A protein has these predicted regions:
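Membrane-embedded transmembrane helical bundles of large multi-pass transporters/channels
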Residues: 1-47, 142-406, 527-534, 539-660
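Short, conserved active-site loops that position catalytic residues or coordinate cofactors/metal ions
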Residues: 44-46, 78-83
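Short hinge/gating elements
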Residues: 48-51, 409-411
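Membrane-proximal amphipathic alpha-helices
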Residues: 52-56
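Structured non-transmembrane domains adjacent to transmembrane bundles in polytopic membrane proteins
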Residues: 57-78, 85-175, 403-603, 607
């Protein structure tokens, strides 16, 4: 242990000495590297891949593949063209909707779609108003078409089918909504970044009362940001896949938080060294020697904790893990070298007008209030009372998370005037909302044909299920044609298509599906189909799979993150009980944060749900980021505890650490 401590101490002293002594080279070198990196950084691309939201072994994905294999065509698509005229679509416009869809099937349409599935709300059409005002056409494309290519092709299709009086509205569906969401993120992220940086600058300025401290923090962000984006660009280039657009806000939030924390750690220690009477360069060196181990340990813990996301079954989290880990690693490396060098270069201006401690004591005689409170709180009786009170508050706040509702409703989450949402609203004026993403129920009997009477009875039962506006199935299949969308030739597989009466990606639709799944054994048994297997396909089933996967992954990811934190904190502290207690507090604080989030967004603001991956990504960030503060506080207490009783060490170190 002593040899390892000596080696790490030598490395710390060497790095601190180099950063301070070579400050005139280090600062411009990092600035030049940031400029070059910014010229070659483009990891987030509009129209790039959407999130990999569904586990590869999802039953819904298998059912979707089975449906396509058995019936040769899906019941719907993720790209839908919408036409609507409140006065009614003309007969000519309706005829063009059908004719254009037929042209797609025959390969005579230049959109590139493999299949077009048109629906018009004519009188008697299921799950519709029946007033001939609305037409929706599901366009099915091959896998070689990128999301943006599909949307562009759908827009061209709409322009052709809607002229001159076809009342075009727009293109909607899951894929257009996600692309629109990504575009909005990329268009607004710059403003959000600017406002966030300005807020950080103001906070640092107010806390340190020193313009130089804000300059150091902003300069560090300015250097770390382009270098991080370049590193992520290289990862995307090597892997052959640009990062999902939804990742950028998480990367930005993490980078700004980590860089700000580390810069503040150095600045706070540098100010303390100056107040103790050290000269500027000596203070910079001493501050670097004190903070470098803390930043390095915190960065390693945070990076490895984020890599624990690789344990997820969701592609989104697996993609997120290396991106966030690299973000932390770059922030750590920049902070370890650039920040001490910049502080040494600026000298006292970095925290000007900081006064020596003697002047502070003279201006405010007596023991400072912070250490007195910390010394009082460190006494065991009062510490126990404070701990119990804090735990009670955290538990109460955390209990609010029980009402958390997870959703995947990407369309309804868009601004009201966005193209996909406008088109979806127009479609919902003529059809039930589920017409944009119908649910497929596939019933199969591997040994013999399914009884027609039983299928007819089951179809009637499905139409009466709560949460669904209509259903079609084998009873609607036209006999004597080669098209068999509901019943296979051998009669061993049947497909029922159900239309939800609510947003098909909402928590309500997922609950309706869960209720249907629970009722299906009884429904099938009463129809004489008890021996048949049942599968569920469609966007609602996929949304259910995604939410279930995240919920199922939550414990696995949490255990992985906590284990990494525990092991590394134990190595850093050379203890086991203290890391366990700190992790327990972290878990309670994360639960409380999640509970307050649920209360504010669902109860106060009235949102029906929270996007399903946000709470878990946020929880991982909170647990990991809090480890930085644990390392900082514990490191300072441990250092003070080498020469004084623990209570006095806490009284001395806690106020100084809290200022950072």
């Amino acid at each position: 242990v002593s040899r390892r401590s000596h080696a790490s101490g030598f490395a710390t002293r060497l790095l601190a000495w180099l950063a301070v002594r070579l400050r005139f080279l280090v600062v411009p070198a990092f600035a030049a590297a940031a400029v070059l990196a910014g010229l070659h950084a483009d990891p987030f691309q509009t129209g790039g891949p959407v999130l990999d939201l569904i586990p590869k072994d999802s039953p819904a994905l298998k059912a979707q593949a089975d449906s396509l294999r058995l019936f040769r065509a899906p019941a719907g698509s993720d790209v839908i063209v919408v036409q609507r005229d409140p006065a009614g679509l003309s007969r000519d416009a309706q005829s063009r909707v059908i004719a254009q869809a037929v042209a797609v099937g025959r390969g005579h349409d230049r959109s590139g779609a493999q299949l077009a599935i048109p629906f018009i709300n004519v009188p008697g059409a299921p799950a519709s108003t029946g007033d001939s005002t609305t037409a929706i056409t599901h366009l099915v494309f091959g896998g070689s078409y990128s999301p943006t290519e599909r949307i562009r092709a759908a827009q061209g299709y709409l322009a052709r089918v809607a002229r001159p009086d076809g009342a075009p509205v727009g293109v909607t569906g899951v894929t257009p909504a996600r692309i629109e969401q990504g575009t909005l993120i990329l268009n607004r992220i710059g403003l959000v970044e600017l406002l966030t940086v300005l807020v950080i600058a103001v906070i640092v300025l107010v806390v340190f009362r020193a313009p130089g401290a804000a300059v150091v923090t902003m300069a560090t962000i300015g250097v770390a940001f382009p270098i991080t984006l370049w590193a992520l660009t290289e990862i995307a280039r090597i892997s052959g896949s640009p990062l999902p657009q939804e990742v950028e806000p998480l990367v930005v939030a993490l980078l700004l938080g980590v860089v700000t924390d580390y810069a503040v750690f150095f600045l706070s220690e540098f100010r303390d060294q100056l107040r103790s009477g050290a000269e500027s360069r000596d203070a910079a060196t001493a501050a670097a020697q004190a903070v470098i181990p803390i930043v390095f340990t915190g960065g390693v813990i945070l990076s490895l904790s984020l890599l624990a996301l690789r344990a997820s079954s969701l592609g989104f989290f697996r993609q997120l893990a290396p991106a966030l880990a690299v973000t932390v690693a770059v922030a750590m490396l920049v902070s370890l070298v650039f920040v001490p060098a910049l502080i040494a270069l600026l000298g006292r201006f970095a925290v000007w007008p900081t006064r020596p401690q003697a002047e502070v004591d003279e201006a405010a005689p007596g023991r400072p209030i912070g250490p007195r409170i910390a010394h009082l709180a460190a006494g065991r009786p009062l510490a126990a009372l404070i701990g119990i009170a804090c735990v009670a508050v955290l538990v109460f706040a955390g209990l609010q998370a029980r009402s958390l509702k997870l959703g995947v409703d990407v369309i309804s989450g868009l601004p009201a005037d966005s193209g996909p949402r406008v088109a979806a609203r127009a479609a919902a004026a003529g059809f039930a909302p589920g017409a944009l993403a119908p649910l497929e129920v596939i019933v199969r009997n591997r040994e013999s044909a399914l009884p027609p009477a039983g299928l007819a009875q089951l179809e009637q039962q499905l139409r009466s299920q709560p949460g669904y506006a209509g259903a079609v199935g084998p009873a609607e299949q036209v006999k004597g044609t080669s098209v068999q969308p509901f019943l296979t030739r051998d009669g061993r597989a049947a497909r029922f298509v159900l239309v939800s009466d609510t947003d098909p990606l909402s928590p309500a639709a997922v609950r309706d599906l869960a209720h249907l799944q629970a009722q299906m054994p009884g429904l099938a048994g009463s129809a004489g189909l008890g021996g048949a297997s049942v599968e569920y396909a469609g966007q609602t089933a996929l949304a259910q799979s995604a939410v279930d996967a995240v919920s199922g992954d939550a414990l696995k990811i949490a255990l992985a993150v906590l284990l990494v934190n525990l092991v590394l904190m134990a190595l850093f502290m050379r203890a086991l009980l203290a890391p366990l207690v700190l992790l327990a507090v972290n878990v309670l604080s994360v639960a409380a944060t999640l509970g307050l989030t649920v209360w504010f967004f669902q109860d106060v603001l009235g949102y029906p749900d929270i996007t399903y991956y946000v709470p878990f990504a946020g929880a991982v960030l909170l647990v990991s980021l809090s480890s930085d503060y644990n390392v900082l506080i514990v490191g300072k207490i441990w250092a003070e505890g080498e020469n004084r009783p623990m209570r006095d060490a806490i009284a001395s170190a806690a106020p100084r650490a809290s200022r950072a």
